[in-house]
């Protein structure tokens, strides 16, 4: 019940920030949020001052530390970039990925090894959905979670002799010294309403962009060239030295989720041709920070998206959620439901069997990121 109330409050605040007040009550709430925004800004300035005056010093490790972060709250497409860089850099280096493990049981001060590069050592509830998904896709690359990234980096160096550490969501994490800061900018909603949390979606003032070495504008294929240039011009106002890349995602595979007959001891991933999506009527389901991008990728792949069900980011699926999805599919006479890799790792064998029992195909759309820039980003990082 508490979780439901929290989700409703979160949804109300997000809609209020995006759409503006509609009542006196809304105006009062925004006034309170504005006061909290000023307090938050003061805390950011104080924290930055402590580090600038060397009163607090970041920890250092021998490995090169590459941070992939953002300046706004919510999904900006960091995870596909982390996977892309990890695969590229692992071709020539010993790479370890470190993440906080948001909403995981291991989200604590002490680091936890999710994957040693050969085996996944935890389950999805302990690792968190994004980290567990990365572990399934990054064979050969260890993953560590922990809120204290310095401790996690030391573990990466000690246990895996890491040469490169990729810090997932590390732009505002000052405890660990970085060699490279990559900042993702969401092409669909780049600058968080221009206001700080909780009045807007900015994690820190836009002046913080001057710390970036590289900018990657995600979902560049979903916006016009004029809008893209506007974003680049704004970035240039705060940082003229950072190199800007455009990131696009493309659907690269389709998987059907099934279960072994009788004992159902394992989940089966059957590869399907992407062509099956062309003209297919589907229901799209996801719990992402920015679901619009997923729906657009489906449409670009040729699917006819009849209905969408969007849950909160990092949503923990319950039996009634699956009942809702199945009932909607039956009402619309749709026999294909498509979700994301991030969501699929939270589906149990019993959950998947529910779809099979109702003759509904459950598919996962796999995407990969491509970068457009003057030089290959991974090659540049290798030279740091």
From Swiss-Prot:
It comes from the Bacteria. One of its GO terms (molecular function) is tetraacyldisaccharide 4'-kinase activity. It catalyses: a lipid A disaccharide + ATP = a lipid IVA + ADP + H(+). The keyword Transferase applies. Its EC number is 2.7.1.130. ATP binds at residues 72-79. Keywords: ATP-binding, Kinase, Lipid A biosynthesis, Lipid biosynthesis, Lipid metabolism, Nucleotide-binding, Transferase. One of its GO terms (biological process) is lipid A biosynthetic process. Signal peptide: none annotated. One of its GO terms (cellular component) is plasma membrane. Gene3D superfamilies: P-loop containing nucleotide triphosphate hydrolases. Pathway: Glycolipid biosynthesis; lipid IV(A) biosynthesis; lipid IV(A) from (3R)-3-hydroxytetradecanoyl-[acyl-carrier-protein] and UDP-N-acetyl-alpha-D-glucosamine: step 6/6. The keyword Heme does not apply. Transfers the gamma-phosphate of ATP to the 4'-position of a tetraacyldisaccharide 1-phosphate intermediate (termed DS-1-P) to form tetraacyldisaccharide 1,4'-bis-phosphate (lipid IVA). Belongs to the LpxK family. This is Tetraacyldisaccharide 4'-kinase. It comes from Halothermothrix orenii (strain H 168 / OCM 544 / DSM 9562). The gene is lpxK.
């Amino acid at each position: 019940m508490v979780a439901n109330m929290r989700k409703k409050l979160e949804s109300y605040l997000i809609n209020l920030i995006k759409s503006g007040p509609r009542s006196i009550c809304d105006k009062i709430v925004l006034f309170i949020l504005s006061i909290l925004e000023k307090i938050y800004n003061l805390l950011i300035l104080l924290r930055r001052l402590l580090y600038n005056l060397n009163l607090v010093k970041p920890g250092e490790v021998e490995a090169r530390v590459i941070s992939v972060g953002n300046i706004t709250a919510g999904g900006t497409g960091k995870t596909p970039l982390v996977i892309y860089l990890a695969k590229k850099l692992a071709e020539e280096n010993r790479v370890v990925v470190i993440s906080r493990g948001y909403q995981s049981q291991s989200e604590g001060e002490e680091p936890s090894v999710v994957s040693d590069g050969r085996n996944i050592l935890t389950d999805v509830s302990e690792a968190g959905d994004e980290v567990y998904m990365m572990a399934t896709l990054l064979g050969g690359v260890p993953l560590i979670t922990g809120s204290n990234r310095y401790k996690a980096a030391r573990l990466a160096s000690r246990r895996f002799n890491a040469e490169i550490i990729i810090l997932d969501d590390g732009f505002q994490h000052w405890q660990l010294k970085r060699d490279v800061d990559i900042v993702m900018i969401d092409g669909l909603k780049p600058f968080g309403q221009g206001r700080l949390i909780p009045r807007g979606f900015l994690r820190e003032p836009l002046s913080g962009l001057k710390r970036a070495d590289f900018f990657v504008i995600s979902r560049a294929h979903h916006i016009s060239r004029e809008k893209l240039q506007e974003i680049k011009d704004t970035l240039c106002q705060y940082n003229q030295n950072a190199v800007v890349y455009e990131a696009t995602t493309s659907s690269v595979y389709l998987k059907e989720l099934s279960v072994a007959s009788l004992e159902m001891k394992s989940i089966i991933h059957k590869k399907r041709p992407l062509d099956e999506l062309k003209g297919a009527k589907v229901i799209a389901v996801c719990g992402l920070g920015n679901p619009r991008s997923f729906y657009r990728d489906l449409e670009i792949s040729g699917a006819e998206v009849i209905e969408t069900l969007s849950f909160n980011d990092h949503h923990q699926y319950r039996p009634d959620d699956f009942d809702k999805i199945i009932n909607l599919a039956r009402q619309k006479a749709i026999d294909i439901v498509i979700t994301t890799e991030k969501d699929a790792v939270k589906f149990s064998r019993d959950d998947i069997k529910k779809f099979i029992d109702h003759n509904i195909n459950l598919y996962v759309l796999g995407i990969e990121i491509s970068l457009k820039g003057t030089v290959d980003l991974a090659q540049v990082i290798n030279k740091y």
